Amino acid sequence: MDIRQDYPLSKRNTFGIAARTDWWIDYTCDADIDRLVKDEFFQDCRVQTIGEGSNLLFLANFHGILLHSEVKGITELHKDQDSILLRVGSGMVWDDFVAYAVENNYYGIENLSLIPGQVGASAVQNIGAYGVEVSQLIEAVHARHYRTGESRVFRNEDCRYAYRYSIFKEPDYAEWTIMYVDYRLRLKPSFSLEYKALAKVLEEERITPTLQSIRDTVIRIRNSKLPDPATIGNAGSFFVNPVVSAEKFNTLQTEYPSIPSYPQPDGSVKVPAGWLIEQCGYKGHRSGAVGVYEHQALVLVNYGGATGTQVGALAEEIIGNVRQKFGITLHPEVKYIL
């Protein structure tokens, strides 16, 4: 376990916000959690779990303890002719795990290449891209309650997964920190190519689908649309794509015939938040050190020196204008930390 005081966070969040935390703790195993449970100072402090800082926005310095997983490793639990069950440490970099799966011919997560963050965060956020959500592959989440020390295995159904949602986002589950995630990956060739943008590139460039070619293509597409946080601070998609009723969508389509849409199984319709933002004139918008990325309106950026409150203010401005124009309220996918 590694403990640091008055710790700078500019390199611990992909927005590059220059906040600080009173305390930063890296944990590597169950024994570290056991120590923290017995520590009176820790138990008296405000605690927030954090991964790679790729889906959050610091609005101010954090007064308390940021708890960060350094639990690593991949263990094979079971293998049959169709699938393999892997237990992965929550502190492993997500894209390193994707690369490992591709190298070992394990199918299922290749569409999720280059998504920033850790393995633990994948289970919290239910990350998704190009027609795949990680909840389709998660079998169980192993967690510890950092106040009581309780250990619990959350089966997939216990996590209540939905679009960009899991039970771990609820306040009642905020004190659970993830140790390991179990993923069941396929051993037989099987690809998810229903997503139009991905399928179009593969077809136009006559790319034969393989694990590596799909991973490479996804990485290329993502790099063409999203800025590198090492160069321009950002948290990827800032807003959740809104889901509206079929009736609401039909009304919008009458006024905006070119509006993109993704019909959902329950009859509702998902509308790209980036398209809504772009129609409000924000694509490429800049106000001082903050702005909207020129190649993807869903991405808010820090050009250097911006504060979290400045980014948040731009987000609220966008929310207001989208609501006024379309009657749709956007919700941040990024978590605000006060």
Swiss-Prot record:
What cofactors does the UniProt entry give for this protein?
Answer: FAD
Q: Which GO terms describe its cellular component?
A: cytosol
Spell out the subcellular localization from the entry.
Answer: Cytoplasm
| Active site per database record | R164, S237, E333
**Short name of one Pfam family:** MurB_C
Q: In which pathway does it act?
A: Cell wall biogenesis; peptidoglycan biosynthesis
Q: Which HAMAP family match?
A: MurB
Record-annotated FAD-binding PCMH-type domain positions: 17-188
> What organism is listed for this UniProt entry?
Porphyromonas gingivalis (strain ATCC BAA-308 / W83)
The gene designation is murB
Please name the NCBIfam families in this protein's record: murB (TIGR00179), PRK00046.1 (NF000755)
Per its record, the protein catalyses: UDP-N-acetyl-alpha-D-muramate + NADP(+) = UDP-N-acetyl-3-O-(1-carboxyvinyl)-alpha-D-glucosamine + NADPH + H(+)
| Record protein name field | UDP-N-acetylenolpyruvoylglucosamine reductase
